[in-house]
Each structure stands twice: as structure tokens, then as C-alpha cells.
Amino acid sequence: KDLKWKTGAIKAIKVLNELNYLTVVITNQSGVARGYFTEKDVNNFHNHMNSQLKKRKIIINDFYYCPYHILGKGKYKKKSLDRKPNNGMIKKAIRKWNIDSNKSFFVGDTFADQMSAQKSNIKFYKANKNLYLLIKNILKYESRQKFL
């Protein structure tokens, strides 16, 4: 219910799907560690995203999230190699989907996103106000089998 898509995001994912690009979400979710919401809530949110996309015949291929934070509570209070700026989640996606990092790109909006991509030797692009226009420009310069 709290889902608000960034401008151009749905159209960007649609274009990537149509061109057979792999789309993967990599996200830190410290709200789990802090007790604001649960892992089930995160998974439900991701499922809700894809259910909205499915109505338009669009899909995000996979989701990776890190629920841990050093200031978290209970079992979630810890350092994690998955938490960006580390690249554990990207490594998992690379293994699962047989992704070629040299032919991939990562769109993100934080310095942690940029560092995570760099540690994986993946080209990074800073998200702007319109993700569709950004993806359109990226596609002018990139080859197939991409990572988002």
C-alpha cells in the first residue's frame, strides 16, 4: 500500500524486459534490524511490486535484501557482507543468474550502491529523476545481459 514508483521506473523495467535484460533489486533494509518491519513485510512488499508489474506483463527477476545493521536489535544486530557498501548480495545474484559483471550495470541512488557495484566490477549509474530516460541513455552504450 505504501508503494510509490520512482518516475519512469515501470517504463524502464518494461524496456529492459522487452530486450531480455535481467532485472534484479539489491536493497539494504535496516528497518528490519531496527524493528520497524519484518522480513515477511519486505518479501510481501517485493511480491506487491511484482504483482503490480505483472498486470503490465513486466517482471523484476529477483530481489536481494539485507536485514542486518550494527545498530539493530536481536539476531539482526550484526555486520554483514551482504549490507551495502559490501557486495555480498551482488555476488549471490552473480552466482545464481550466471551474470557477467563486465556486461552488467547497476543503477542506484546512494554512495553505498556505487561502492557495492565497484567492488563487483560492475559499471554504476546514478539514478536521476526519470529512470526511463536514464535507462534509455544507458542502453545506447551498453551491450546485452544487464544488471539493474
Which positions does each model-derived feature cover?
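Short, basic/glycine-rich phosphate-binding loops at helix/coil junctions
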Residues: 23-24, 64-75
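Short, acidic loop-to-helix structural element flanking the phosphoryl-transfer center
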Residues: 1-26, 33-47, 81-87
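Short, flexible active-site-adjacent loop segments at beta-strand->alpha-helix junctions, enriched
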Residues: 29, 67-69, 110
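Short alpha-helical scaffold segments that flank and stabilize functional sites
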Residues: 12-15, 30, 96, 119-120
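A short acidic, helix-capping loop that chelates divalent metal ions and anchors anionic groups
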Residues: 32-36, 71-76
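Asp-based, Mg2+/Mn2+-dependent phosphohydrolase catalytic module
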Residues: 40-61, 73-106, 110-148
